[in-house]
């Protein structure tokens, strides 16, 4: 009988010790999980050079996005562009082409914990395009004119990201823009499809929620 009582007592003691170790282990795991959940937000500006209908085109880019665990960005992007089409209209005037579009920005990121990252941005959105008068480089954009047309855009790309600091990230990359058909007099530009390449800067906080306590619980 004493043997069974001793065995039961030993089992109860072992169960209590195991339970205590499990709780401690659970706390330890939960503590370390904080280190793996990293968030970020940023504002980004960029400039790109490319072509529309074979003519030089300049782009300015703006982004605001949330970065989830250094693995994917989700936010809003906007692009304005000016294309030197030089379409002759009269002795002194030529027509160039301009527009703007914006929409959803999603950017999966590879090697997010490294100094250099590789990412695959894609933007899906809409905007408007217009022909503008170029009178010896005196650009005249008339917002009241009727010759505006809506355009829908899908723009995938490839970026190389350099983490300069916790607050600044540089990017360089290229992208290809697919657009809906444009039917706008004088019907020179049929769409705004084309490659562009350039660079940009992002300013924000890229690792909010990072665990700053490097010691294990057992070290304290």
PLM regions and their residue ranges:
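Short glycine/proline- and aromatic-enriched beta-strand/turn motifs that initiate or cap beta-hairpins
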Residues: 20-69, 202-220
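Outer-envelope beta-barrel architecture signal
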Residues: 35-41, 70-72, 114-120, 166-170, ...
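Residues that define the transmembrane beta-barrel architecture of outer-membrane proteins
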Residues: 39-41, 56-60, 96-102, 116, ...
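Membrane-embedded beta-strand positions of outer-membrane beta-barrel proteins
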Residues: 43-45, 64, 76, 106, ...
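Transmembrane beta-strands of outer-membrane beta-barrel pores
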Residues: 47-51, 78-84, 124-130, 176-180, ...
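Outer-membrane beta-barrel translocator domains and adjoining extracellular loop/strand segments
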Residues: 55-57, 86-91, 130-139, 182-189, ...
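Gram-negative (and chloroplast) outer-membrane scaffold detector with strong preference
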Residues: 71-140, 150-152, 164
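Predominantly the C-terminal beta-signal and adjacent terminal strand-loop region
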Residues: 163-220
């Amino acid at each position: 009988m004493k043997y069974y009582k001793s065995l039961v007592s030993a089992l109860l003691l072992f169960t209590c010790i195991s339970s205590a170790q499990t709780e401690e282990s659970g706390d330890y795991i939960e503590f370390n999980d904080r280190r793996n959940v990293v968030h970020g937000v940023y504002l980004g500006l960029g400039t790109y050079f490319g072509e529309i209908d074979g003519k030089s085109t300049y782009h300015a880019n703006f982004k605001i996005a949330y970065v989830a665990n250094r693995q994917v960005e989700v936010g809003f992007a906007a692009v304005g562009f000016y294309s030197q089409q030089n379409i002759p209209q009269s002795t002194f005037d030529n027509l160039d082409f301009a527009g703007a579009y914006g929409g959803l920005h999603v950017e999966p990121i590879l090697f997010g914990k490294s100094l250099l990252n590789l990412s695959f941005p894609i933007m899906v959105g809409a905007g408007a395009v217009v022909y503008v008068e170029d009178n010896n480089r005196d650009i005249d954009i008339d917002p009241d004119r009727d010759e505006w047309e809506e355009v829908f855009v899908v723009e995938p790309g490839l970026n190389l990201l350099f983490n300069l600091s916790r607050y600044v990230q540089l990017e360089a990359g290229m992208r290809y823009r697919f657009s809906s058909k444009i039917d706008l007099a004088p019907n020179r530009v049929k769409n705004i499809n084309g490659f562009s390449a350039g660079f940009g800067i992002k300013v924000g906080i890229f690792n909010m929620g990072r665990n700053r306590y490097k010691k294990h619980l057992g070290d304290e």
